[in-house]
């Protein structure tokens, strides 16, 4: 039974958290298995039929069904969960109600509380044209949208004007920009506000001084008898003019565009405010004579009157005054219409009143131009009373003139007022928008507001998914050198099970590349820089070499095998192909049942075995050269385990000979598939597969597909054996695996899938990496029949090979006790045992010999069956010339569906 996920973590999580992108076949299967689909928009779930979405195939939801790859799905939606058939869109959930209703009913309505611009953006996102809006909502939608677009256009123009102030092409750009902001943008800083207040005070002071200079009590008489300005007030005015001049020059020097500065209306007002003063000084100082002064005096008076224009400088600091000026400029059509109406009325009524009043004595309507004044003040409803008609006909004309004046003025005036109010509000909105934009820019620069795309967030989460936090104060000699914060899926015991269930076969090679070395003082931390997702082939090769070059450690006593952490395991999957050879009778040991055993890594073996191999991998490839692999058995067989430790070789001899002469014990081997599984647990060693040699092999084929040792590799070892006839293996009742079905026919080779697991011991239970050859593993060579004179045992590397059965750490002690109780049955339990049938002597290959002295004798797990006996049993018939042998390894309660997560799938080895 597989380990279950922690209760805090939901197994039905998003695709992006526990598995790699699924294959197209899984996506298509998920869509075809259900007629309905779940649409999650902003956290609000909607359920709709697929055929409803097919009504609008060119929209975003219509394209959802045609997306069969991971990339195309992420282009349409933001996330998805194939297990729940759910697709997530990070959009406004309220607007989606109207959009989904459009799919169902064909009627598109806009909600009353929805912003028109936001609803338009939602329509653009979902791929629906706004022309489908119903007539009841169309007018309101377009009116609001046009209004919002106009406001946004004006705001964009203002921002473009402000952002168009380029200072890069001039000298001292930074200083000039600061000075420009200081003088032109009062809201940019506190200093700018203070400077604006000082400027306003100078404007008010200059206006007051100009008014006081006209008082007779404060005036003085010059040498020509003409009144002149008070000297004290003249000094005040000079200071104000000096301030205005300095301000104007600084603006001009710091302006990014000089010509645009001259054309600005406010700058023209500033120039007119200071220019009359200098013209007056120039005229008075250059013309000292009386005659010249009399000629210049009137010109000087004109320029003195122009000083009053200084009051208009307040418009620079007043939004209302600016709005008035812009309103007059924008309302020139209405103002022209008003003037035209007044001119027509004045002409008509002044003519009528002239002909009505010209015959009266002492009349003031002496001519039509003289009557214009009366018509003007009458139509404007002012009525000074200095001129008025006296006759009856003149009074009637005057009454009609008043009514016409009210009607003529009343028509264009509201338009002008409306323009003023709208422009005033727009100015206020633009000021707030500018402040908001500037605040957002400052916040983004400070990092308080971060905008991130969903795909970028997913990529960053994948990069940061493996994190190791170093414990403070721990040394390298401590038991745990790094504290894993359990963010990495490789650290979860159930994570690989979820991976193998939720992804396709093609992605298996990338799932089991996680390395954790705990038998040395160094630990490979899964950091973001060296996470399995980013390890290159060279780095993986280096890691594997470091693992294989680790120095051997001393054995520990069996009672000291307390495993707080389960050691890392290396799972090697070897597919061996047997060639037909002479028929021999083999003795198979009795099967034993092991119950109450949890195996979390069996799913790894199953998914590795269940991978669909290509035709190239199914058949052995011809070698590039005659390279023969010889696996030699030792001739001496020690009797005891201690004697074996003293005399046995640390590992088996693996030689490679060239030429066709090496035909004895030749093994034909094909692509290796070694899966390095990062998991910890107690292990047992079993040697699987028939160790039969062939003395008459012609030309063994050998091909080796070199790949990264940490990546998934498959080894096909073809034993060539001349057999006259052999019965086929009976079909298994369990679901067979694609690569483990065996065929003992005469013409077809036998594929044997054997799982060898290499485990690294825990920190406190160091096992020999360069293990001695087990005693009972060597017993086979000594007790072989003369029919097997040249059989040789083989080993694949310098490290121990163990049959893979991962046991939960919580049940290690019980399992060891169970194995200790069965120590006396070692001679009767073997995974793949060979003996001579006529002598009735069994030479078992027990697991104790391969497992070393650190654990009690263990049963051959590759031959075991559980209490259900669901798989076909081993059949042995002494009366037959040949016999059938079946080797099965499976777990109880097999679930064939990937969604069933309670138990691990079956692992089967048939021979």
UniProtKB/Swiss-Prot annotation:
Residues 1-190, 255-265, 318-332, 425-911 are cytoplasmic. A motif (Selectivity filter) lies at residues 381-386. This is Potassium voltage-gated channel subfamily B member 2. It catalyses: K(+)(in) = K(+)(out). Inhibited by quinine at micromolar levels. Modestly sensitive to millimolar levels of tetraethylammonium (TEA) and 4-aminopyridine (4-AP). Residues 369-380, 381-388 dip into the membrane without crossing it. GO terms for cellular component: dendrite; neuronal cell body membrane; perikaryon; plasma membrane; voltage-gated potassium channel complex.
């Amino acid at each position: 039974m597989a380990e279950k996920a922690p209760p805090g973590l939901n197994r039905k999580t998003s695709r992006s958290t526990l598995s790699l992108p699924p294959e197209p076949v899984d996506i298509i299967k998920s869509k075809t298995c259900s007629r309905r689909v779940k649409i999650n928009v902003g956290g609000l779930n909607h359920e709709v039929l697929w055929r409803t979405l097919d009504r609008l195939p060119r929209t975003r939801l219509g394209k959802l069904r045609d997306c069969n790859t991971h990339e195309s799905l992420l282009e349409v939606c933001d996330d998805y969960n194939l297990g729940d058939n759910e697709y997530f869109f990070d959009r406004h959930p309220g607007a989606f109600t109207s959009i989904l209703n459009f799919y169902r009913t064909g009627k598109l309505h806009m909600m009353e509380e929805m912003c028109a611009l936001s609803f338009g953006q939602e329509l653009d996102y979902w791929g629906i044209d706004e022309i489908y809006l119903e007539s009841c909502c169309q007018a309101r939608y377009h009116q609001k949208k046009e209004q919002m677009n106009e406001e946004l256009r004006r705001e964009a123009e203002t921002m473009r004007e402000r952002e168009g102030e380029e200072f890069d092409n001039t000298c001292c750009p930074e200083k000039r920009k600061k000075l420009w902001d200081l003088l032109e943008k009062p809201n940019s800083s506190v200093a700018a506000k203070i400077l604006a207040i000082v400027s306003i005070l100078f404007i008010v002071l200059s206006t007051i001084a100009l008014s006081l200079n006209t008082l007779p009590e404060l005036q003085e008489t010059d040498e020509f008898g003409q009144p002149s300005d008070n000297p004290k007030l003249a000094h005040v005015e000079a200071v104000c003019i000096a301030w205005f001049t300095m301000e104007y020059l600084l603006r001009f020097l710091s302006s990014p565009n000089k010509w645009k500065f001259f054309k600005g209306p406010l700058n023209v007002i500033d120039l007119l405010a200071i220019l009359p003063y200098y013209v007056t000084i120039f005229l008075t100082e250059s013309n000292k004579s009386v005659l010249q002064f009399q000629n210049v005096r009137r010109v000087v008076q004109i320029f003195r009157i122009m000083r009053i224009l200084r009051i208009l400088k307040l418009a620079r600091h007043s939004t209302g005054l600016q709005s008035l000026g812009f309103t007059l400029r924008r309302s020139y059509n209405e103002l022209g219409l008003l003037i035209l109406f007044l001119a027509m009325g004045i002409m008509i009524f002044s003519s009528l009143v002239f002909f009505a009043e010209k015959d009266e004595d002492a009349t003031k309507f002496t001519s039509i131009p003289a009557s214009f004044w009366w018509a003007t003040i009458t139509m404007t409803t002012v009525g000074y009373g200095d001129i008025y008609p006296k006759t009856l006909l003149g009074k009637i004309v005057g009454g009609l003139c008043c009514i016409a004046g009210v009607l003529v003025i009343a028509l264009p005036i509201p338009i002008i007022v409306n323009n003023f109010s709208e422009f005033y509000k727009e100015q206020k909105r633009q000021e707030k928008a500018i402040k908001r934009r500037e605040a957002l820019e400052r916040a983004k620069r400070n990092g308080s507001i971060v905008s991130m795309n969903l795909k970028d967030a997913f990529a960053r989460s994948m990069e940061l998914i493996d994190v190791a936090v170093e414990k403070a104060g721990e040394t390298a000699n401590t038991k745990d050198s790094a504290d894993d914060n359990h963010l990495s899926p490789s650290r979860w015991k159930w994570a690989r099970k979820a991976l193998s269930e939720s992804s396709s076969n093609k992605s298996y090679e990338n799932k089991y590349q996680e390395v954790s070395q705990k038998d040395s003082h160094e630990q490979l931390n899964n950091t973001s820089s060296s996470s399995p997702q980013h390890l290159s082939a060279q780095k993986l090769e280096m890691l594997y070499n470091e693992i294989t070059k680790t120095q051997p450690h001393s054995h520990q006593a069996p009672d000291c095998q307390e495993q707080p952490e389960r050691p890392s395991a290396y799972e090697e999957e070897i597919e061996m192909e047997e060639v037909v050879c002479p028929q021999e009778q083999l003795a198979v040991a009795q099967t034993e049942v092991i119950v109450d055993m949890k195996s979390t890594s069996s799913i790894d073996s199953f998914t590795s075995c269940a991978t669909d191999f290509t035709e190239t991998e199914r058949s052995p490839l011809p070698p590039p050269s005659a390279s023969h692999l010889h696996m030699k058995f030792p001739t001496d067989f020690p009797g005891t385990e201690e004697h074996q430790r003293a005399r046995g070789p640390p590992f088996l001899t693996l030689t490679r000979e060239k030429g066709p002469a090496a035909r004895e014990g030749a093994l034909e081997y094909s692509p290796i598939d070694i899966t390095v599984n990062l998991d910890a647990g107690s292990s047992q060693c079993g040697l699987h597969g028939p160790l039969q040699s062939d003395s008459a092999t012609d030309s063994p084929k050998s091909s080796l597909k070199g790949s990264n040792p940490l990546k998934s590799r498959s080894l096909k070892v073809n034993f060539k054996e001349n057999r006259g006839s052999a019965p086929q293996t009976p079909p298994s009742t369990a679901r067979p695996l694609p690569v483990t079905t065996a065929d003992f026919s005469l013409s077809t080779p036998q594929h044997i899938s054997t799982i060898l697991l290499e485990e690294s011991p825990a920190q406190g239970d160091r096992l020999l990496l360069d293990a001695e050859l087990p005693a009972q593993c060597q017993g086979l060579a000594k007790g072989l029949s003369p029919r097997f004179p040249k059989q040789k045992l083989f080993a694949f590397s310098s490290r121990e090979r163990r049959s893979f059965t991962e046991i939960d750490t919580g049940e290690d002690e019980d399992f060891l006790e169970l194995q200790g109780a069965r120590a006396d049955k070692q001679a009767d339990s073997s995974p793949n045992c060979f003996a001579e049938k006529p002598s009735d002597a069994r030479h078992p290959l027990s697991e104790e010999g391969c497992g070393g002295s650190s654990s009690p004798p263990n049963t051959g797990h590759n031959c075991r069956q559980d209490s259900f006996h669901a798989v076909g049993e081993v059949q042995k018939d002494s009366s037959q010339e040949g016999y059938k042998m079946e080797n099965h390894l499976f777990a109880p309660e097999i679930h064939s569906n990937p969604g069933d997560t309670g138990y691990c799938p079956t692992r089967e080895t048939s021979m």
